[in-house]
């Protein structure tokens, strides 16, 4: 399941974030790569321990945890804190699958979901599409600055070469309360239906029944 979430940050907020990020020191992006991915990866990143990275990462996580669509789709349990990358001058990241486990200062994170928050407007660079292969085929993603795409970490994906301009983004992984992607999809569809019926003032009894089904399935499938 691939979910696009528009306008996580406004254009003005993105400009402020970019001003801070662009002023930092960018380094070789292979610091977060596995052995196989490192042979396919050519980009730049900010140091994960940079205080600006840590502060903006906290801001991004807080914004996502307050976003109903993100919470409904991801059922987040734990983040691997956001990192930031930049592509320019033909830089690319060939097809790969993200590492299953990431280590943080608080322990280990199973990467159930990956997310990219775009911080460059799509008309300011050529190439740089996030191409994801999933059960529904191949999808090419290039969103407006401030928008985010969420997708299963099991997906084969790549960033195509940036042939002109500059593509800056935040990327992150998270562990969901529900490990299985199919179960998460069913819960998301059920939750979205409940929200739509609530907005249409559907009869309370039916809403109570559906809400009960949702929470009982979440109780059965969640791992905390």
UniProtKB/Swiss-Prot annotation:
Gene Ontology molecular function: any one? L-ascorbic acid binding
Q: Which GO terms describe its biological process?
A: DNA damage response; intracellular iron ion homeostasis
Keywords from the named record: Dioxygenase, Iron, Metal-binding, Oxidoreductase, Vitamin C
- Which residues does Fe cation bind? 96, 98, 157
Positions in coiled-coil regions: none
Enzyme class label = oxidoreductase
Which ranges carry the Fe2OG dioxygenase domain? 78-176
Superkingdom of origin organism: Bacteria
How does the cofactor bind to this protein, according to its record?
Binds 1 Fe(2+) ion per subunit.
What cofactors does this protein use? Fe(2+); L-ascorbate
EC number(s): the record gives: 1.14.11.-
Which residues participate in 2-oxoglutarate binding?
167
Q: Which NCBIfam families match?
A: PRK05467.1-3, PRK05467.1-4
Q: What is this protein called?
A: PKHD-type hydroxylase Shewmr7_0698
Task: Please report the organism this UniProt entry assigns to the protein.
Answer: Shewanella sp. (strain MR-7)
Q: What is the lineage of its organism?
A: Bacteria, Pseudomonadati, Pseudomonadota, Gammaproteobacteria, Alteromonadales
């Amino acid at each position: 399941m691939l979910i696009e979430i528009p306008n996580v940050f406004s254009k003005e907020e993105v400009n402020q974030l970019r001003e801070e990020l662009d002023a930092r020191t960018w380094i070789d992006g292979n610091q977060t790569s596995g052995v196989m991915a490192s042979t396919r990866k050519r980009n730049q990143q900010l140091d994960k321990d940079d205080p600006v990275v840590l502060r903006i990462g906290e801001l991004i996580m807080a914004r996502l945890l307050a976003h109903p669509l993100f919470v409904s789709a991801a059922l987040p349990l734990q983040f691997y804190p956001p990192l930031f990358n930049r592509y320019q001058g033909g830089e690319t990241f060939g097809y790969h699958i993200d590492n299953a486990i990431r280590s943080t200062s608080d322990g280990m994170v199973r990467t159930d979901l990956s997310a990219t928050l775009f911080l460059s407007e799509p008309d300011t660079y050529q190439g740089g599409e996030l191409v994801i292969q999933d059960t529904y085929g191949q999808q090419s993603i290039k969103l407006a600055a401030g928008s985010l795409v969420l997708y299963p970490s099991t997906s084969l994906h790549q960033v195509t070469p940036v042939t002109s301009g500059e593509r800056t983004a935040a990327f992150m992984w998270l562990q969901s309360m529900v490990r299985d992607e199919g179960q998460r999809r069913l819960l998301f569809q059920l939750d979205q239906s409940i929200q739509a019926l609530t907005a249409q003032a559907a009869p309370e009894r039916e809403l109570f029944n559906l809400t009960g089904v949702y929470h009982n399935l979440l109780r059965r499938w969640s791992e905390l």
